[in-house]
Regions:
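Bacterial N-terminal signal peptides that target proteins for export
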Residues: 2-13
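A short helix->beta-strand "capping" segment at the edge of beta-propeller domains
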Residues: 23-37
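Beta-propeller fold detector
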Residues: 29-32, 72-76, 115-119, 157-161, ...
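Beta-rich, blade/repeat-based domains predominating
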Residues: 36-48, 79-91, 95, 120-133, ...
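Conserved beta-strand positions in repeat-built beta-propeller and related beta-rich domains
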Residues: 51-57, 94-100, 137-142, 179-185, ...
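A short loop-to-beta-strand structural motif that recurs across blades of beta-propeller domains
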Residues: 60-63, 102-106, 144-148, 187-191, ...
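Short loop/turn segments that connect beta-strands within beta-propeller blades
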Residues: 65-69, 108-112, 150-154, 193-197, ...
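Blade-level signature of beta-propeller repeat domains, shared across WD40, Kelch, NHL, RCC1
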Residues: 297-326
Length: 326
């Protein structure tokens, strides 16, 4: 069942509004994973439509072929490595962060071979990876650092976040070449210079805000899930303006994974309600989509723009989810 409404709170115009509910055909289709206690944390999708995911609990990299429903598991070379984030590079290579052993891993999709790469000592607890110009960037939540790894030279460089215990988490590319990071332990966002690695912190006006994941749209606007306060937030780097929308589930809904759909809507998860939310940037309206299996938490999602699909890692339920937008 899907309902629609809108509540917006701007840091410049503190006004609330309510819009009547409306129906929608969107649903979440689920794929059961082969292990009962599989724990999919992050998904990624390649240009060929194949979905990859990390099974953090069992230390597997999973492959799902949507055309056949076939699922293939690849155990990580180091047992109990705790794979967390995952990304498919332009060359097809599948990169992931091995959280428990302070390494990066690369899976060759043609052979299934996985190679691990050790990170510096101050890169303890790597979390979210992305690829920019062939370089793998990553956040290190426990070490309060972030870094980059060059696959050609196998050299890594790590920087410390200025604010202590900032817990750098979500990491995304922006159209202008910069990289944005959610500083989950603070009420701050971070902008990383994609060439120099220098980080500039931006403070969210609400001191209790805790951004967990974020995305950047085609205009450079930053959208983030405020996990602590139950809001969807936006930041305009050009004007410095922040704006917020209270999530349908309210202050305790715990917004988590977030993505931009091919049609421009912002999709995010309410971790404590088992609900996906679709936000229309033009109208400010929100739609709620109930995830079928109770206890599902979407820590991250992946967008297949070519096929108009959003893939969800349904942590806690041993499932992968799909939303068809067509």
């Amino acid at each position: 069942m899907l309902s629609r409404y809108s509540r917006s709170l701007s840091t410049l115009i503190p006004a609330l509004g309510l819009i009547a509910a409306a129906a929608s055909p969107l649903t979440v289709v689920e794929y059961q994973l082969p292990r009962e206690r599989a724990f999919p944390h992050d998904p990624a999708v390649g240009a060929d439509g194949i979905v990859w995911y990390t099974d953090q609990q069992n230390s597997f990299i999973g492959r799902l072929d949507p055309a056949t429903g076939k699922i293939t598991d690849y155990p990580t070379p180091t047992p109990a490595s705790g794979p967390h984030g995952i990304v498919v590079a332009p060359d097809g290579g599948v990169w992931y962060t091995a959280q428990r052993i302070s390494k990066l891993g690369r899976l060759d999709p043609k052979t299934g071979h996985i190679e691990e790469f050790s990170l510096p000592a101050n890169a303890r607890d790597p979390h979210t990876p992305l690829v920019r110009k062939g370089i793998v960037w990553f956040t290190v939540q426990g070490g309060n650092t972030y870094g980059r790894f060059d696959p050609r030279t196998r050299e890594a460089k790590v920087w410390t976040v200025p604010t202590e215990r900032a817990l750098p988490y979500g990491l995304v590319n922006a159209p202008d070449g910069s990289i944005w990071v959610a500083l989950f332990g603070t009420n701050k966002l971070g902008r990383i210079d994609g060439e120099t690695g220098a980080l500039r912190e931006i403070t969210i006006p609400q001191t209790a805000a805790r951004p967990r994941r974020l995305v950047v749209d085609e205009m450079g606007m930053v959208w983030y899930s405020d996990y602590a306060r139950g809001y969807l937030g936006s930041y305009n780097p050009k004007t410095g303006a922040f704006k917020e929308w209270l999530s349908p589930g309210g202050a305790s809904s715990a917004p988590y994974g977030i993505a931009i759909a091919p049609d421009g809507r912002i999709f995010y998860d309410e971790a404590r309600s088992g609900t996906m939310v679709a936000f229309d940037r033009k109208s400010g309206q929100m739609e709620t989509i109930k995830i079928p299996t109770p206890g599902s938490i979407v820590r991250n999602m992946a967008v297949d723009s070519t096929r108009s699909r959003i893939w969800l890692a349904l942590s806690g339920t041993s499932r992968i989810g799909k939303i068809e937008l067509k």
